[in-house]
Every structure is written in C-alpha cells, then in structure tokens.
UniProtKB/Swiss-Prot annotation:
The keyword tRNA-binding applies. This is D-aminoacyl-tRNA deacylase. GO terms for biological process: D-amino acid catabolic process. GO terms for cellular component: cytoplasm. Its main location: cytoplasm. One of its GO terms (molecular function) is tRNA binding. InterPro entries: Daa-tRNA_deacyls_DTD, DTD-like_sf.
Length: 145
C-alpha cells in the first residue's frame, strides 16, 4: 500500500462539479492499493501517515504530526501509484489491487483515519476527480508498506 502525502495549506477534491471533500491545513493523501494489501498494511500505513512529523513546531523544526498541528486528511484514491514504469513508455497497472478489493481497503483506511479523531475528507473512489491544493513547502513524501 502506498501513500503519496503532501503537506498543504488547503486542499479540495471535486467530482462532476461537486466538491466532495476539503481540508484546511493538513495532508493530501494520494492512496494506492497494491495486490496483496490487507487491513494490517492499511493500519500500518495510517499509523505512519498520522504520526509522520512533518509540520513545524514553535522553533520552525519539522517536529509535529498532523494531529499535533491541528490538521486534517484529504484521502484520494490513486491507482496509478501502483504502476510499474520500468519497461517501455506506457505504465503497467498489473500490480494494482483488483478494483473491488482496492475500494474495500480504501474505505477501510478512510474509516480508520476518521475513527482516529483526525478530521478526514475524501474524494470518490475510481472517479475522475479534480484535486486542488496549495502545497506548504512544498513537502512531499512517498510512504510504502
């Protein structure tokens, strides 16, 4: 399971002209589900995402996690993160989880995030989405479990 996280001042996602989710300060989480992923991997990745200390403390040092910074999560499904780009000029998505399983684990990740007390907003699984964000930094990390 993969999360590409970006520290943002604000972010939103729109599907078919309707805003489905928005946050102020926090993390935009692009979430990719791979073959073989399960709830244990989702839990491990959420623990890493929610605990990752990439927000500045009072001394300007990256020392706070998203909760400590008073931020939220905007979780957006992103199957292209599971792409194999090693050969040719066209990505292969054979490493991605089957859509039914990917949606189940995406929903699980989102539910666990919300249950943890972090304000959590979402896009719509497998939809054509428009994501708007204001990067803060920019600060971007690839987390994979």
């Amino acid at each position: 399971m993969i999360a590409l996280i970006q520290r943002v001042s604000e972010a939103s996602v729109t599907v078919e002209g309707e805003m489905t989710g928005a946050i102020g300060q926090g993390l935009l989480v692009l979430l990719g589900v791979e073959q073989g992923d399960d709830e244990a991997k989702a839990d491990k990745l959420l623990h890493k995402v929610s605990g990752y200390r990439i927000f500045s403390d009072e001394n300007g040092k990256m020392n706070l996690n998203v909760s400590q910074a008073g931020g939220g999560l905007l979780v957006v499904s992103q199957f292209t993160l599971a792409a194999d780009t090693n050969k040719g000029m066209r990505p292969s998505f054979s490493g991605g989880a089957h859509p039914v399983e990917a949606e189940r684990l995406y929903d699980y990740f989102v539910a666990q995030a919300a249950a943890s007390g972090i304000p959590t907003a979402t896009g719509r699984f497998a939809a054509d989405m428009k994501v708007a964000l204001v990067n803060d930094g920019p600060v971007t990390f690839w987390l994979q479990v």
